[in-house]
């Protein structure tokens, strides 16, 4: 990832840092239009997720999370930007003529060869079941349910680690720090997701944030009492409570939101940090 630093020619470009290396020219048979409805609203039109709305129109890229082209080698043809995720994607041309997008593994370059199957080398970008991987392997795009496709460790720079295998299950340490059990028959991709420097980007101006579909964030302490529990007071006043709360009065900053009784609790050996 090449970070391009803007010159301070205008206030909006001061200290800006963007990635100017990867472009987007998707294949027409691997994209389709999508209507992003809601913008943070529920079925009643009430805001349930704040600071969302607007943004540039997007085309969805069909990503192959299943990697079910077994024992057929594929070659990386392009590395492209995807507006629907912070990781890059790469176009794969398989030997049987199939063309698919996958998540870009860190370090992969155009011309590299990848393959998926049961008896494939443990090398970057190859996909295989957890039972065929040695302990300590760095992996991403991990299946939870067999055949459903990868659901874990798909963000830019994400990587999990295979730390144990016992019985029918494998123990993984996920990017969040959570340690959980996964069926050994589930598949994963070797290596780390690319674009690890995504957190080094500096948009530099509010307009760039709006293009991404993110609206301005207003602090509750500067609102009126009718709008937020932190609002009101004369001048710059404290929040007036022992602990900060959400606009609806619930505890904020660290409250556990996971259901107390969930079916997957038995698979989690250690909660996330």
From Swiss-Prot:
Database matches in SUPFAM superfamilies: Nucleic acid-binding proteins (SSF50249), Translation proteins SH3-like domain (SSF50104)
Single GO BP term: mitochondrial translation
Disordered, as annotated region: 1-23, 224-273
GO cellular component: chloroplast; mitochondrial large ribosomal subunit
Keyword annotations from UniProtKB, A to Z: Chloroplast, Plastid, Ribonucleoprotein, Ribosomal protein
Pfam family, one: Ribosomal_L2_C
Compartments (UniProt record): Plastid, Chloroplast
Signal sequence bounds: none
Transmembrane segments: none
A Gene Ontology molecular function term of the record: RNA binding
Subunit structure: Part of the 50S ribosomal subunit.
Family (UniProt): Belongs to the universal ribosomal protein uL2 family.
Entry protein name: Large ribosomal subunit protein uL2cz/uL2cy
Species in which this protein is naturally found: Amborella trichopoda
